[in-house]
Amino acid sequence: MSKGTLFDKVWDLHTVRILPSGQTQLFIGLHLIHEVTSPQAFAMLRERNLKVLFPDRTVATVDHIVPTENQARPFIDDLAEEMMRAIETNAKDNNIRFYNIGSGNQGIVHVIAPEQGLTQPGMTIACGDSHTSTHGAFGAIAFGIGTSQVRDVLATQTLALSKLKVRKIEVNGKLSPGVYAKDVILHIIRKLGVKGGVGYAYEYAGTTFESMSMEERMTVCNMSIEGGARCGYINPDGVTFEYLKGRDFSPQGEDWDKAVDWWKSIRSDEDAQYDDVVVFEAADIEPTVTWGITPGQGIGVSEAVPTPESLAESDRYIAKEAYEYMKLIPGSPIKGTKIDVCFIGSCTNGRISDLREAAKFAQGRQVATGVKAFVVPGSERVKQQAEAEGLDKIFVEAGFEWREAGCSMCLAMNPDKLQGDQISASSSNRNFKGRQGSSTGRTLLMSPAMVVAAAVNGKVADVREFI
């Protein structure tokens, strides 16, 4: 069993008791909620005549079903409008901080919490959303939970959980130009598999992660769940503290100094023991593109779609399914694959640094004829900052649509969807069948810079050729 890791320290500090089942009753420091997984949970509270125990530890926003074009109320989609009204009512009735559309603070839940300083090292964080692992970038232990667990946290501020093992994933060295955090995590998932992290928390370490910005670290931790890990985290350091300093909910004055001292104390010990250690080299990572129907089916942009013979026996069944669904020929280069739609955004890559990098490659270029391309900021704050920097104009002049904040085409719960068998170049996190709104639509995951390269060329391209 692991010992002396940040995970162990934070887990122990938040343990209420060991339950008869052997699980740990864990106190949750911050509960983030949104409009999709919370209505049923609140309904269950009402059935039992229960109130939210710690409204001050609960923060709500709307993101999944929010239209990114016409946001006039009532929404055209009746179910979306019903969800909106439910969270508005539930937040008001329970005195929960709620960031609605137009508040200046609304956005994807995993974007707004970090940018406001709500997410801090040493916290336990829960949200009814798979990509809650994002917050681990700050040295927090963050779990995605189901609706019944959302109910439990609302009512008790605790969760019954089994303690995870800890795998240390080291990546060392400097990334080459055109290679980003998105490529790093896609490479890790490719190598360890989509089920490789089941039962584990991932601790990301090594010089590559140490040199990343907080927003890059969030991209990595965001996709931990795609590798099977319940959570992923990075030990807090000077980069973390610099990012948090002065944000809305960050400690101030003397409290700041005390907080930093404590945050340093929860870092994994030098002699910490891990259940497993895996090491990668940054030099081995190139711009990565998924070719199949799981985030683990990724290859370097210079590679070809793998042939069945090149795969492990255990990977061949899902590969066969992927060949048929994606309509890609084994052995054919991924570079040059025709693209219909290009999407930049999501909780993986919808932050200001993502948009800045994408705009750098969009400037002075044009989206290819026949390609629909759009950019969706991860939050209203990101949108405001991007517009202050003129990024919106760069995108629009290049032929991209500039949208309002929301989850958008990451998932099929709002008007932004693929049509028919369109194929998208997407900076999001999942390429499952039908994920982007069409039962025959196809998704290729890649970095925002690679999405721009695809948009300009009308096909999968190597962004390094733009440098």
Swiss-Prot record:
GO terms for biological process: L-leucine biosynthetic process. Catalyzes the isomerization between 2-isopropylmalate and 3-isopropylmalate, via the formation of 2-isopropylmaleate. Pfam families: Aconitase. It comes from Gloeothece citriformis (strain PCC 7424). Keywords: 4Fe-4S, Amino-acid biosynthesis, Branched-chain amino acid biosynthesis, Iron, Iron-sulfur, Leucine biosynthesis, Lyase, Metal-binding. The keyword Amino-acid biosynthesis applies. PROSITE patterns: ACONITASE_1, ACONITASE_2. Belongs to the aconitase/IPM isomerase family. LeuC type 1 subfamily. This is 3-isopropylmalate dehydratase large subunit. The gene is leuC. Its EC number is 4.2.1.33. NCBIfam families: leuC, PRK05478.1, PRK12466.1. GO terms for molecular function: 3-isopropylmalate dehydratase activity; 4 iron, 4 sulfur cluster binding; metal ion binding.
